[in-house]
Amino acid sequence: MVERARPSLIWEGSLWQQGILRVAGVDEVGRGALAGPVVAAAVILPAQMDPKELEGVRDSKQLRPQQRAQWAERIRQVALAVGVGSASAAEIDRLNIRQATVLAMQRALAKLDPIEHILLDGLPLAELGSRQTALVKGDHISLSIAAASVVAKVWRDALMQSWDRQYPGYGWRTNAGYGTREHRLALQNLGPTPQHRRSFAPLAELKVSRYDG
């Protein structure tokens, strides 16, 4: 079996060597969910830190829930700064998912001022300014981006679990608002809640337009 590459500080280190010390890794979760916000986190790690301090951190999808929770706490202890931002279902419907994701990232980054450079998972986003480096599969190769993915995932999952008590029947405690079979059946039987994304195809196709819970 081929071992997956671990996120490292190679990209951060190259910037630190140039005197660029406040480097924020940014990532988001929840883009494809049918309910709940899209959430972004931004993490600034200390320059020249020992990567062994966060050696178990991976892209959040590669970790079990308990591991994510433990590492999210450790990340907050080690990091110079951590910011979380979100954009609601209503904002997603009004703006579209891309613009709402950018908004969530901007809100997360606003909590970290000053920032000298951004490391971003995926493609460049002009809205975040010129001082950025976009990395394909950045959450697999950059430790600060991977850390951001863990923080964002833990924050969003906790929110969806709290909403599961407020809106029972949709299985948000386990599906986090994603379109599982259980969730789609609940939509047909119960209708959408105020936390559902009405602009997403499965919701737009529903004839039921109100929540009766």
UniProtKB/Swiss-Prot annotation:
Main location: cytoplasm
Localization, UniProt: Cytoplasm
Lineage of the organism: Bacteria, Bacillati, Cyanobacteriota, Cyanophyceae, Synechococcales
Keywords, comma-separated and alphabetical: Cytoplasm, Endonuclease, Hydrolase, Manganese, Metal-binding, Nuclease
Protein purpose: Endonuclease that specifically degrades the RNA of RNA-DNA hybrids.
Reaction(s) catalysed by this chain's protein: Endonucleolytic cleavage to 5'-phosphomonoester
Cofactor or coenzyme needed: Mn(2+); Mg(2+)
Major enzyme class: hydrolase
UniProt record similarity statement: Belongs to the RNase HII family.
Disulfide topology: none
Gene Ontology BP term (one): DNA replication, removal of RNA primer
Cofactor note: Manganese or magnesium. Binds 1 divalent metal ion per monomer in the absence of substrate. May bind a second metal ion after substrate binding.
Record-listed E.C. numbers: 3.1.26.4
Gene field: rnhB
Superkingdom to which the source organism belongs: Bacteria
Protein name: Ribonuclease HII
